């Protein structure tokens, strides 16, 4: 289990083709839940590529089924199509965004459609499709609420976290 968690945590380096001698990656891990069945780690930070004008905000998660030693992802809790519809709906809710950030995202959202978002969410989370493919979205479940990232332009913060509570929808 520990080796799998470590490999997933460090996979951002190869998947984003980071040069450890020139690029900078700063990530903090928070274990948001852990019990005998499941462990969920949330990683947040920044990466700065050599020669880049600014750092990019990084968000990724790893939820592991400890009994089966397998990664759990968005598809274990819901489906990409449903979440795409939710993100495009008037009911969408966010985690940790200001009113200004919410308004900016809602304007940006007009450039998105069901197909784009469904593809993003269907490819969310670990395991990676290949060692050089990094998902555009990561998710976790906390107390019945599904939290997942939506990629946005750098000017909007690189990602927003959307929350979905199936029991209230």
Residue ranges and their predicted role:
Residues 1-169:
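Compositionally biased intrinsically disordered regions enriched in Thr/Gly
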């Amino acid at each position: 289990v520990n080796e799998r968690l470590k490999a997933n945590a460090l996979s951002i380096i190869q998947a984003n083709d980071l040069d450890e001698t020139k690029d900078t990656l700063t990530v903090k891990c928070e274990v948001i839940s852990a019990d005998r069945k499941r462990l969920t780690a949330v990683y947040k930070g920044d990466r700065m590529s050599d020669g880049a004008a600014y750092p990019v905000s990084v968000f990724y998660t790893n939820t592991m089924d400890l009994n089966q030693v397998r990664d759990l992802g968005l598809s274990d809790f819901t489906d990409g199509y449903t979440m795409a519809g939710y993100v495009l709906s008037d009911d969408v809710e966010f985690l940790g965004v200001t009113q200004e950030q919410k308004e900016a995202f809602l304007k940006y959202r007009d450039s998105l459609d069901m197909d784009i978002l469904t593809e993003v969410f269907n490819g969310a989370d670990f395991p990676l499709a290949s060692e050089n493919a990094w998902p555009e979205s990561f998710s976790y479940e906390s107390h019945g609420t599904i939290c997942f990232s939506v990629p946005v332009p750098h000017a909007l913060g690189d990602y927003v976290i959307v929350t979905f509570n199936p029991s209230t929808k």
